[in-house]
Regions:
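Active-site-proximal segments of metallohydrolase catalytic domains
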Residues: 220-296
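Short pre-active-site segment immediately N-terminal to the catalytic Zn-binding motif
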Residues: 196, 293-316
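Extended acidic/polar, glycine-enriched regions
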Residues: 109-176
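N-terminal prosegments of processed precursors
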Residues: 26-116
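Fold-level signature of zinc-dependent metallopeptidase catalytic domains
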Residues: 154-215, 225-235
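Bacterial N-terminal signal peptides
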Residues: 8-20
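Catalytic Zn2+-binding segment of zinc metalloproteases
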Residues: 317-333
Length: 477
């Protein structure tokens, strides 16, 4: 009993210390958190940016001031915060965007759209230039937009309204500055369902830390949970005529994909999240239907009540947290390929232009053929039939239990097929990845990023560990 009381006291103390709701709590060591909200608009041919507002969030900067520069080389974009007077880069982080994905869809060829975006950084003492960079066709970053931010300017919003909800400490391992802070948000939960949300958040967080390398690095994480109640249970699924006004605006059918779940209401997301310490966000949608999504450096989503919620939570977090590529290629997606096979920036996919320079070559045993043979023809044949059946069942709006049974049977078939393959557990270069049947290669035959299996391949594990180190590792000198 005394141990239980002591744990409760320590959690409460850590919570009070970590989320003191006042900018005054910031110090020289931990400055305030500054946020630049902006509009990112355009189409398949071009893009534009425009400032919406600059504000100071209620909580101090959650990250380490000793690890402010990103050397991971991840993301389609990168933000740099530069001291105007000296030209010194004070802060940088790679990220990707919903606009970046949308711009490769058919709609972007005929329509111009705007998306809300934000970048957060430690509040500087002097005026800074915020630069947004984008990868070019060579994979190198170049500046596409910049704007000057004066932290002392009169139009900086310095006072936020009182928090409508408070974060729940799920896992507190230490001070936020020394840890990765993951915030689990709920969307589509009524006031009566808040207990269910907390229980699900705890269950899924616990599951995340059973999967390597999160299991071995669990002490490097803090996890918080928070949800604003809604009047109706669930989020929108337009393809079935279901529309709900959920607080975060999360919905299915993004880009016309029935399983793709995102929110495009960035302001609603950030205005709620700012009341908890966070660097990463996963949104649990209060729905049974299979679905999720993940954008590197933005957020990820998962259907909380689906039979595959554990898998969805981890798979989508892999996208958001580490910028891992999807390794599957048989499921339909809205993105349009331009036919080119440029080297992906993601750590777990390659165009294999030069096998001698394979980016995960250190994982490959001597004598492993590159490309690496696997039963691709048999896999593809089954996948075509499976995708037809899946599409037919979705068109008929069959019960989710039937869909889950289909997914389970598909995974069992894959496991049985792969069990006979000589390179079953090898690290190599297996053709078929990044939504393409040919021209892109994945590190191992099977991985959480390829199908609904339970483990990350060794290359993905390394990619995840790199990001953990960026936020919670020993600072480089």
């Amino acid at each position: 009993m005394q141990q239980t009381l002591m744990r409760s006291f320590l959690c409460a103390l850590a919570l009070a210390t970590a989320i003191t709701p006042a900018v005054q709590a910031a110090s020289h060591a931990q400055p305030a958190t500054m946020r630049l909200d902006y509009q990112h608009s355009g189409n398949a041919l071009g893009e534009h940016y425009a400032v919406e507002r600059v504000l100071v969030e209620p909580l101090p900067w959650p990250g380490s001031m000793a690890r402010t520069l990103d050397d991971s080389n991840r993301g389609v974009n990168m933000v740099e915060v530069v001291d105007i007077k000296s030209g010194k880069v004070l802060y940088s982080r790679g990220f990707s965007t919903i606009f970046g994905e949308w711009s490769s869809t058919d709609e972007a060829k005929t329509t111009t759209r705007a998306f809300q975006e934000s970048v957060r950084f430690p509040q500087p003492e002097q005026p800074v230039r915020v630069r947004i960079l984008k990868r070019d066709e060579r994979g190198l970053f170049s500046i596409v937009w910049s704007t000057d931010v004066d932290p002392k300017a009169q139009d900086v919003i310095r006072q936020q309204p009182p928090a409508s909800v408070k974060p729940i400490p799920i896992r507190v391992s230490g001070a936020s500055a020394d840890k990765v802070d993951l915030l689990i948000l709920g969307d589509g939960y009524t006031a009566a369902e808040m207990g269910s949300f907390e229980a699900t958040a705890r269950k899924l967080a616990d599951h995340l830390f059973t999967v390597s390398p999160f299991r071995e690095r669990a002490d490097d994480f803090n996890v918080w949970a928070m949800a604003a109640p809604t009047q109706e249970s669930g989020v929108s699924r337009p393809s079935t005529g279901v529309h709900h006004a959920s607080p975060l605006g999360t919905r299915y059918d993004i880009f016309g994909s029935e399983r793709y779940v995102l929110t495009t209401d960035n302001r609603a997301l950030r205005d709620l999240a700012q009341y908890a310490p966070y660097e990463f966000i996963e949104i649990l949608v209060n729905n049974d239907t299979y679905g999720g999504g993940g954008i590197f450096g933005q957020f990820s989503t998962a259907a909380a009540n689906n039979d595959w919620a554990n898998y969805l939570f981890v798979h989508e977090f892999g996208h958001h947290f580490a910028g891992l590529a999807d390794e599957y290629y048989t499921s339909p997606v809205a993105y349009q390929s331009n036919g080119e096979r440029q080297e992906p920036w993601e750590p777990n996919a390659t165009a294999l232009r030069d096998p001698a320079k394979l980016k995960w070559k250190s994982h490959v045993k001597a004598g492993t053929p590159l490309p690496t043979p696997w039963p691709k023809e048999a896999y593809d044949s089954h996948a075509r039939e499976y995708q037809k059946e899946r599409a037919a069942r979705r068109a008929q709006n069959r019960p989710e239990s039937e869909m889950s049974a289909l997914f389970k049977a598909d995974l069992a078939h894959t496991e049985q097929l792969f069990s006979k393959a000589p390179q079953r557990h090898a690290v190599g270069a297996f053709e078929g990845a990044n939504y393409e049947s040919t021209g892109f290669y994945r590190p191992e035959m099977q991985c959480i990023m390829f199908d609904r299996s339970e483990t990350f391949c060794s290359v993905c594990q390394d990619g995840i560990s790199t990001i953990i180190d960026l936020y919670a590792g020993t600072p480089k000198r």
